[in-house]
Structures are given as C-alpha cells and as structure tokens.
Amino acid sequence: MTILNHTLGFPRVGLRRELKKAQESYWAGNSTREELLAVGRELRARHWDQQKQAGIDLLPVGDFAWYDHVLTTSLLLGNVPPRHQNKDGSVDIDTLFRIGRGRAPTGEPAAAAEMTKWFNTNYHYMVPEFVKGQQFKLTWTQLLEEVDEALALGHKVKPVLLGPITYLWLGKVKGEQFDRLSLLNDILPVYQQVLAELAKRGIEWVQIDEPALVLELPQAWLDAYKPAYDALQGQVKLLLTTYFEGVTPNLDTITALPVQGLHVDLVHGKDDVAELHKRLPSDWLLSAGLINGRNVWRADLTEKYAQIKDIVGKRDLWVASSCSLLHSPIDLSVETRLDAEVKSWFAFALQKCHELALLRDALNSGDTAALAEWSAPIQARRHSTRVHNPAVEKRLAAITAQDSQRANVYEVRAEAQRARFKLPAWPTTTIGSFPQTTEIRTLRLDFKKGNLDANNYRTGIAEHIKQAIVEQERLGLDVLVHGEAERNDMVEYFGEHLDGFVFTQNGWVQSYGSRCVKPPIVIGDVSRPAPITVEWAKYAQSLTDKPVKGMLTGPVTILCWSFPREDVSRETIAKQIALALRDEVADLEAAGIGIIQIDEPALREGLPLRRSDWDAYLQWGVEAFRINAAVAKDDTQIHTHMCYCEFNDIMDSIAALDADVITIETSRSDMELLESFEEFDYPNEIGPGVYDIHSPNVPSVEWIEALLKKAAKRIPAERLWVNPDCGLKTRGWPETRAALANMVQAAQNLRRG
C-alpha cells in the first residue's frame, strides 16, 4: 500500500499577480481576450509543473478560476442569471465577468451577483442565483479543457469539482420562494455527464468537494446525500472532500455513501484518526489533510507523522493539504526582507508541497530523519524571545471583569456627551477614510521606497489632512475625520505599528476576482511600543473647532484579517491586540480627542462554522472590543462601524459591545436592516448608512431624506446619525463632494422639519 500525496488546489493568481494584471488589462480594453487566455494557460502549466517538481503525485485540475470557482461551477451547469445572458444564449468568459463584476468588455452592464465569504475564510465567492423551474445543462467546459491540457503535458491528473449539494447550499433563491434543494434532481444529470466525460479521458479519481458536510445541516439536506451520490457512482472513483472543520458529527451520513474515498481536514477538525479508521468502510481510501492550507506556518512534521502513523498499512492512505492552498501565498523563497529566524518558521504553498513530499516519503520508508530536520526551526520557535513577551502575558493574565466595563451605563454617558459636544439633531459624519488619490498613494510609495525623507513625507500627509478638514467644514459636516491619508490598509497600518506582527513583500492571496490582499502575520505576543494614531488625530483637531474622530481598527478585525499564530488561541491574540489598542484610546483621549471610532467589520464573519460554537466566540469577541473601549471616560463617545447584511442572529452581541454609536451599512437593503435593531429595541445611537459608497452614483437629497424618514419610523430620531455606509477611500473627490453635500442638505431639511 504505497502512500501518495496531493493538494486540494493551488493559488491561481501567480507569484507576481500575473492573473490580476491580465484581468484588469482585459477589462480596461488594453489587451485582447486571446492574450488573457494565454496568461491563464501559462499560469496553469507553471503551477502544475511547480507542484510536480516539489514532489506532488496527483495534481489538482479545475481549481483554476477566471474569477471564482463557485462562479465557474454555475457556468458549468448553465446557471446564468437572465440579466447576464448573451442575446444568442451562448456563454463566454465575458458572461462570467458580467456575473462577477456587473460589466465586461462585451454585453450589456447589469447588477453583479452577490458576493459573500467562502465558509469562514477571507476568500469571497459569487452566490449562485436560483429561480423556480430552473433548467440546467452542461454549458461551460473549462474543466474538461483544462483536464485535456494537463493530460497533454503528461501529468497525473485529479480533477476537482464542487459537489452538487454544497453548490445548492451556497446559493440563494431569487423571486418566488421555494426550497432550492428541490433543484438537486435537475442538476445531477449535468454532474453525471461531466463524470462520464472524465471517465472517457481515463481519469481514475475525481475530487468532489462537499465542505457543507462539516456544517450543522438541516436533516433534509443530510438525507439528500445518499440518493445524490447513488446517482453519481460508477463512472470514476470519487474522493468525497471536506475541509475547514471535522466530519465526526456527520459521519453516519458520510459512511453510507457509495464513494471510494474521504478527505478530512485534520488541522481544523477535531476528528480522531483511529476513530475515523474504525468507522470508515475498510475499502475506502482516507485522504489525511495534515498540512494547513490556510496559514503560513511551517509544520512540525514529527507531530504530523505521529498523528497518522498508526494506520499506515491498514488502509489506502494519501496525505494532503487540509484544504486548497488558495488561501496561502505562493512561494517563501522570494521573500528577501524577512530575517532568517522568522523566515525559518514559515511555509507558503510551494513549501507546503515540499512538506507533503517529506511526509509521504517518511510514511513509506519509516525513516523520519528528514522530518526532524525540517521541524527543528518550528520547535525552536516555542522558546524564542521574538514570540514571548512576559509583560504582555502578565498583563493579559491580570485582566478582570472591571477592565471590560465603562464607568457608567449608556444613559449617563449620553448625557455627558450631549453636554460636551452640543451636536444638532440628525448629526452628520463620515465613516473615516477620504479618497486615496494618486498623489497620496505616490507620496506613501516614495517614502516607503526611500525616495522621500520623513520630513517631506510628513509635510505632504499634513497637507492632505488639512485639505480633508477644509472640505468637511465647507460641506457643513458636524463630526469630522482626518481622512486616513497616511494609511495603506486598515489592518496593515496597525500591524506595522504593533510589536508581534511581520509583513511579507509578495505574500499575496486572492480575496475575490482580481482583488488580492497581503495579510500581516502575527508571530508573537502583541504590544504597542508607541502611540500610533495620536499625532495625526491631534493635528487634525488643531485645525477645527468641530470634533474630529480618532479612528482605530478593532481587535477582532485585525485578528480575522491577519494570519494568526497557531500556538495560542484566537481569543488570546484578540485580547492582546485589545490591550494594545486600549492604551491608544487612553492616549487619544488625553490628546483631547473626544470621539473615537473602533471599526469591527469582521466581528460577524469571524463566526465559527457550527452554530453550537458561536456563543463562546461571541463572548470573547465582545469582551475584546470592550477591553479596547472601556478605558474611555463618560464624555468620550465610542463609535463602532460594521458592514454586514445580517444582524438578527447576533443582535445580543452587538448590543453587548456597548458602543455609544454604531454605524452600519443599510443603503443597499433600503433600511431593512434596521428591522433587527427595532425588534431588539437597540438602546444606543445608530447611524444607518444613507448611500452606497461602492457605487459612483450620487444620491439625491430627496432619496436620502426618504431613507432617513424610513429609519425614523424604526429608531427614535434623537438617536439617529446621518452618514454614508462605508469609508470613501475608493471614491473620487467629485462624487464624494456631491454625495456628502446632498447628505448634509437632507439632514438640514429634517432639522427644519
């Protein structure tokens, strides 16, 4: 029984973000479709070859996507919303881009499909839309073409296909409501056809992804698996693939299926290998997801070996990444600025392939010397002074309940804040950032590259802050912001100023479409060596008599949008960040900043996959926010900002944050979101976003007024604020001025009654 290895998928964007550049060039009309397709072919060939050279036996094919793999599946099944269809009914790459972006070089623009987080990762997928009576047929043959490509290059191929039940689970019904699971029998014939085509090509194994099997699914959905897989059996061997959590709770459903193998995530799941071996049919292959596909840490391969060695020789076994390597940067070897010690702790996608090769060889031979050598740096890290800061650990251990309580309840604080700020009814403000112009970006880049000295850089930033204050005063806003000209990214900026974080040069991962992010890495205990935002906030406040908000990114968001440590809990990291930012709140307050906003857009998206785990997460997530904020005096007003489409299920926790003011994204839902706050009887102040900053359209005064009147039917007017629904970083100044002028006018009209 020779053990093989495989990956569940590989990053698509290219080491130098070649895919992103090719997509954006094509969208802008600067290159042809043929040139774009050629870049895709070149990247696929390179990535297959790199994995093979790193020692991977079975190469994933079908993991590449022009925008998103769920969207690719929609096209494969012929699920194209009517508004995005070509007039002749054909499907091409522009159809795909119209669904993803709302527009493409050909065809009519139409509203893009909704985008949401892929399970609990920072990757986003395009939500499939389903209508009653929908028809499906094999339409977009990208998967088959790529299998042919890989076979022609002489590779051992394992096609990757998103499974039918997870696909339906991820979608949403449009128009007349019905149970989307009822479409299962309509999509299964397309899956049968695809599997038949793969069988014709001599494919032995197909990786069929059903990550929905790690969720607490309704019984009807669990019951659908058996008949669905009965219909799919017989043409090729199916590796039923799960990830992001364990499968033990749904193992009875899984073991009844007519598949030939099961992949389990042994990093994020708590499944016991011996128990899995005992319960799985003896003729099934077990694919052990031992290498973390969604982090950047080198694995302790001696531990991984120990985890699996007892079942070697007892059943067919493969070793694999826990999930697709899509969530990891590509190659550590191109990082030249990380010091040698820290660099020795990391493994990116290609290094993870090497880890899988080392693990396979050791399991086949019984010789573990190479594993011990590879694991030495990560074992040495446990005792590194770069990781452990006794002062931080001592401070964290000393936290009491008092540290997460404001001195007085909201009603008492609100009184003190009204007396201090004397704001009018319907107070107007913005969420924090103003347009990041080419001048601002060039200024920051020149400084970063060493082409500009610190004095000239600071003079330039001060000028942009001054301009933002002048613009806001001219517009008549009530509470101002400094505009964040000095910040590249709301998480990266804080990470750069906190001890315990490091940054990469090329550690890009795909967020959605052509958007890539370069998350900070938490390598050790987090602390704040010096004030971060105080100087610029103080400067901005010196330019005006109106209050200027201090702007912080909250601890849960910094955690969720970074690569976390693996040796301590997420709760520990969040609370360490909270303590560091608590000192920032105290320093802002001492500098005369009376309104401080702590953004937590990631609070909801950090929720665990299983609802039964939510309470524990929300408890420490809320506590981290409160530790951050509770140092503020009664007359200091704490704001928070959140952008989600769903509040109902976490309203208790949002109220428990005890922020004096919460601003939320509501414009696209036509204020429907406020229903949650009304039903819950939310006690504090609230700023429902009155226009969508993601669109360049300028809202009319009448439209904003109508939205605010609608809001006032749900929330008492004396507790309402007036603001856009998000930061204005990505907008241009002309539409920003016009939209804010209309927003201020609408508020003034309402004050006059």
UniProtKB/Swiss-Prot annotation:
Belongs to the vitamin-B12 independent methionine synthase family. Its EC number is 2.1.1.14. Zn(2+) binds at H641, C643, E665, C726. The lineage of its organism: Bacteria, Pseudomonadati, Pseudomonadota, Gammaproteobacteria, Enterobacterales. It catalyses: 5-methyltetrahydropteroyltri-L-glutamate + L-homocysteine = tetrahydropteroyltri-L-glutamate + L-methionine. NCBIfam families: met_syn_B12ind (TIGR01371), PRK05222.1 (NF003556). GO terms for biological process: methionine biosynthetic process; methylation. GO terms for molecular function: 5-methyltetrahydropteroyltriglutamate-homocysteine S-methyltransferase activity; zinc ion binding. This is 5-methyltetrahydropteroyltriglutamate--homocysteine methyltransferase.
